């Protein structure tokens, strides 16, 4: 069956704003203003790359502040945008950080983690490019162990054919592989001085690099298992690590997207509690300022400039207001988008319309047991009704409420599906009511169950 997922390529960076919105519409319901804002931000990156001369360096991304309750699509919009363009994407909650000088994570770890993601992305692409050569070299190593290095070419070809067609998968061989056990156990980490740019150093990594990481050990394993170990080893030898790091840093600097959630939780409010907490929250905001405006962060891969990284901050702002953020931080998030609360119609669309909708997901899961689920329109409407009711009466968690409702609705079917003789189940409004009405009408119970 042909996959409905888009093949995400870097070429997608050249998509027009309307094309970007259309792609987002495949997975996300509503929130047109937010989609439009991120589509323009992404297109401006493409435009900037086409600007010639020194002016290109002066054009910086217009960072975005998304305002909206949980479960309305803030994170999903940013995540899908990054996936669409294969951009390094890093999501973090603002509450995870402490002010420089205090124990805890400092904000510069955002960039270190973003670069790590970029390096892993580039390394995966490089391994795909050398996969054929790596596989050939892996087979040669297995043949050395199987028939010896001095065996004739005829013998090697004969056994190579058997390895390739899987005849020898369960044959045990003795082969030398890289010893991946970290030096000294690898569990000893040295925290740097608070606020230092390098974060945490692993002593095992440092010693391993000093020794050249060339330690090997002989292991007995089946040929099919040996292939899964040796191919990555050979790939590592074939790829240019320095080139990968350079490309990864460039990718992070020019295409990276950082999503900072719960930024409202570090805003100072007039009715806030302890004064020390206020100072700490304001300190985190001040630490974020240079990062968002543009600075250079030292990482284990080298210095990384943040000038052209797109920052998307978000928060519900139920208690604090955007104006409670430091004025300097507000100025560095010039584009503000308010996301709408989800209506009953939105809930129905979320259940049905996206390519990876919840109904399709649950139907596919139960379908693996050869049980076909069929939802009537009345059932979908009833599920949406219950989701809105519980969100209003208990706590509004947006579309995430649909997950808990569907889990409770289909609990018995999920448990019994593997042993069911019935191969088709129709979920109608009566079924939904029978399964959920007792929970919905008892709000005290709903608080715990839904």
Curated annotation (Swiss-Prot):
One of its GO terms (biological process) is proteolysis involved in protein catabolic process. CDD domains: RecA-like_HslU. Gene3D superfamilies: 1.10.8.60, P-loop containing nucleotide triphosphate hydrolases (3.40.50.300). ATP binds at residues 29, 71-76, 261, 328, 400. It comes from the Bacteria. One of its GO terms (molecular function) is ATP binding. It holds the Pfam family MCM. GO terms for cellular component: HslUV protease complex. The keyword Lipid metabolism does not apply. Keywords: ATP-binding, Chaperone, Cytoplasm, Nucleotide-binding. It is found in: Cytoplasm. InterPro entries: AAA+_ATPase, ATP-dep_Clp_protease_ClpX, ATPase_AAA_core, Clp_ATPase_C, HslU, MCM_dom, P-loop_NTPase. Its main location: cytoplasm. NCBIfam families: hslU (TIGR00390), PRK05201.1 (NF003544). A double ring-shaped homohexamer of HslV is capped on each side by a ring-shaped HslU homohexamer. The assembly of the HslU/HslV complex is dependent on binding of ATP. Belongs to the ClpX chaperone family. HslU subfamily. ATPase subunit of a proteasome-like degradation complex; this subunit has chaperone activity. The binding of ATP and its subsequent hydrolysis by HslU are essential for unfolding of protein substrates subsequently hydrolyzed by HslV. HslU recognizes the N-terminal part of its protein substrates and unfolds these before they are guided to HslV for hydrolysis. This is ATP-dependent protease ATPase subunit HslU. It comes from Rickettsia prowazekii (strain Madrid E).
């Amino acid at each position: 069956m042909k996959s409905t997922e888009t093949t995400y390529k870097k070429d997608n960076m050249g998509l027009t704003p309307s094309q970007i919105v259309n792609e987002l519409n495949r997975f996300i319901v509503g929130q047109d203003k937010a989609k439009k804002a991120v589509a323009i931000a992404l297109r401006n990156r493409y435009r900037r790359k086409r600007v010639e001369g020194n002016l290109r360096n002066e054009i910086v991304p217009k960072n975005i502040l998304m305002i909206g309750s949980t479960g309305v699509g803030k994170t999903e919009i940013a995540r899908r945008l990054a996936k669409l363009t294969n951009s390094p994407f890093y999501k973090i909650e603002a509450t995870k950080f402490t002010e420089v000088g205090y124990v805890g994570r400092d904000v510069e770890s955002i960039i270190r983690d973003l670069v790590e993601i970029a390096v892993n992305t580039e390394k995966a692409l490089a391994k795909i490019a050398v996969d054929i050569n790596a596989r050939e070299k892996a087979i040669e190593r297995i043949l050395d162990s199987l028939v010896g290095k001095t065996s004739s070419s005829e013998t090697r070809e004969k056994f190579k054919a058997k390895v390739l067609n899987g005849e020898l998968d369960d044959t045990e061989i003795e082969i030398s592989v890289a010893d991946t056990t970290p030096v000294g156990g690898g569990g000893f980490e040295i925290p740097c001085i608070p606020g230092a740019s390098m974060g945490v150093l692993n002593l095992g990594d440092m010693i391993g690099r000093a020794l050249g990481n060339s330690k090997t050990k002989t292991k007995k394993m089946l040929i099919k298992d040996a292939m899964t170990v040796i191919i990555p080893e050979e790939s590592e030898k074939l790829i240019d690590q320095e080139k990968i790091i350079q490309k990864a840093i460039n990718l992070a600097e020019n295409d990276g997207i950082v999503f900072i959630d719960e930024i409202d939780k570090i805003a100072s409010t007039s009715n806030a509690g302890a004064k020390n907490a206020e100072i700490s929250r304001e300190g985190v905001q001040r630490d974020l300022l240079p990062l968002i405006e543009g600075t250079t962060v030292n990482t284990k891969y080298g210095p990384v400039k943040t000038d052209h990284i797109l920052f998307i901050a978000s928060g519900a702002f139920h208690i604090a207001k955007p104006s409670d953020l430091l004025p300097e931080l507000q100025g560095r998030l010039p584009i503000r988008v308010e996301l709408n609360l989800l209506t009953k119609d939105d809930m129905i669309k979320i259940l049905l319309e996206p390519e990876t909708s919840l109904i399709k997901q649950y139907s596919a899961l139960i379908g693996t047991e050869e049980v076909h689920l069929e939802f009537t329109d009345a059932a979908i409407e009833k599920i949406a009704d219950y989701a809105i009711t519980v969100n209003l009466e208990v706590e509004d968690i947006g579309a995430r409420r649909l997950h808990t409702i569907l889990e409770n609705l289909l609990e018995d079917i999920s448990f019994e599906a593997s042993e069911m003789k019935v191969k088709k189940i129709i979920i109608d409004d009566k079924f939904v009511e029978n399964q959920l009405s007792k929970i919905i009408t008892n709000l005290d119970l709903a608080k715990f169950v839904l």
